């Protein structure tokens, strides 16, 4: 069932969350434990992240190095299939421009089609660690809109080389990302909203936000996009604050602000345990306010914060 239909199928604010595929060489059991921990809150869908390959240089000796391509977290498609089959919960794999050619994407879509996984989250993805700006893969894409167009063509029965596909089963549906505090590479919010509108016009059925800690910014963002004629669900993305080190790390890494009230309270914490309790309390307050204002769904980012998300969900669901 499409994500938008899953959201509409409940009278209450829907619950969903995101997980990462396991590191290369490790098993899937830890992911099962995460799902088992959060399953009691009736997740309508589970997102599975995709991670681009990175180039690393291995020393060969005599001053020579060999450049190799490595992916630390492969297995997105397999994890999506395993979770959907084990739990009968809709899974939403991420589809990236970053690190993928058009042909790579086509093979992923074919695998997903065979498996009956038809919900996607379409993203440009991050730049490579060694790059100062985003560089697309050879024969790849610069923008999520281009990726949407390939998915649309696939749904219509056209391969990237123009040859026909025998389309069977349910066509792909997809959402996209948005940022209530502006994408770091966009000069202003007006342009950010312009590109979001283009992504919706290309076929995205909903948008899920980057994490935020200030509900005011989310509400203002939704008001602005509605004025621009964007009427799809804008799903808030939430991650509990849980460590003292995150006071500086979160703004630096994710280019988002921490409200002064949260930052001031965090600076009073003496231990990570105190910070985690504060983060849970803050997140519960955030979620209750969002629910009171009628958000269709709350999407949680529980990486390294599964127990915190569980405590928040217990309080609000």
Language model features with spans:
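Conserved N-terminal beta1-alpha1 strand-loop-helix module at the mouth
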Residues: 1-44, 48
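Glycine-rich, proline-tolerant flexible connector loops at the mouths of alpha/beta enzymes
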Residues: 41-74, 128-138, 204-220, 303-305
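Flexible, glycine-rich active-site loops centered on histidine and acidic residues
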Residues: 102-149
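Active-site pocket-lining/capping segments in soluble small-molecule metabolic enzymes
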Residues: 125, 138-171, 176-185, 223, ...
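Active-site mouth loops of central-metabolism enzymes
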Residues: 14-32, 90-103, 173-191, 267-281
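Conserved, mostly hydrophobic/aromatic
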Residues: 18, 46, 112, 199, ...
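Catalytic cores of alpha/beta
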Residues: 101-114, 191-195, 220-223, 243-249, ...
């Amino acid at each position: 069932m499409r994500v938008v239909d899953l959201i509409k199928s409940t009278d209450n604010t829907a619950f969903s969350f995101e997980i990462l595929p396991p590191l290369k060489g490790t098993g899937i059991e830890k992911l099962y434990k995460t799902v088992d921990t959060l399953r009691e809150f009736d997740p309508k869908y589970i997102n599975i992240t995709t991670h681009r390959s990175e180039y690393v240089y291995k020393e060969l000796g005599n001053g020579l190095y060999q450049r190799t391509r490595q992916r630390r977290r492969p297995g997105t498609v397999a994890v999506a299939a395993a979770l959907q089959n084990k739990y009968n919960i809709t899974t939403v794999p991420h589809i990236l421009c970053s690190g993928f050619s058009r042909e790579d994407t086509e093979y992923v879509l074919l695998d997903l089609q065979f498996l009956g996984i038809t919900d996607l989250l379409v993203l440009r993805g991050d730049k490579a660690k060694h790059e100062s700006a985003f560089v697309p893969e050879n024969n790849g894409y610069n923008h999520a809109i281009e990726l949407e167009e390939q998915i649309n063509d696939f749904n219509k029965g056209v391969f990237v080389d123009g040859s026909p596909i025998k389309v069977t089963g349910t066509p792909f549906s997809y959402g996209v990302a948005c940022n209530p505090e502006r994408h770091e590479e966009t000069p202003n919010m007006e342009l950010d909203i312009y590109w979001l509108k283009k992504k919706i016009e290309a076929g995205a059925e909903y948008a899920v936000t980057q994490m935020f800690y200030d509900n005011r910014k989310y509400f203002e963002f939704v008001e602005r996009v509605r004025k621009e004629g964007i009427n799809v669900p804008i799903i808030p993305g939430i991650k509990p604050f849980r460590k003292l080190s995150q006071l500086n790390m979160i703004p630096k890494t994710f280019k988002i602000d921490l409200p002064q009230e949260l930052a001031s309270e965090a600076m009073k914490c003496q231990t990570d345990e105190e910070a985690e309790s504060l983060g849970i309390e803050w997140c519960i307050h955030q979620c209750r306010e969002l629910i009171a204002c009628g958000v269709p769904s709350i999407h949680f980012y529980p990486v390294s914060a599964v127990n915190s998300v569980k405590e928040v969900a217990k309080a609000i669901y």
